Amino acid sequence: MSEEKLKAKVEQASGSLKEGAGKLTGDKELEAKGFVEKTIAKGKELADDAKEAVEGAVDAVKEKLK
């Protein structure tokens, strides 16, 4: 797992905790902030997945061209 993906997972967990705490306490602002943090982190994770896939495809093409 890449460092970027690990950071994204930690941010997702943090966002989920904030969202849950907001729901539990009725704090809609905290709930919304947690949801946004979690969603952005998921986007970062997906971007890292795409980056890794492209890098893998480039490496495969390079191998075939040798």
From Swiss-Prot:
Disulfide bonds: none annotated. Coiled coil: none annotated. Residues 1-10 have a biased composition (Basic and acidic residues). InterPro entries: CsbD, YjbJ_sf. Residues 1-22 are annotated as: Disordered. Belongs to the UPF0337 (CsbD) family. This is UPF0337 protein M6_Spy1542.
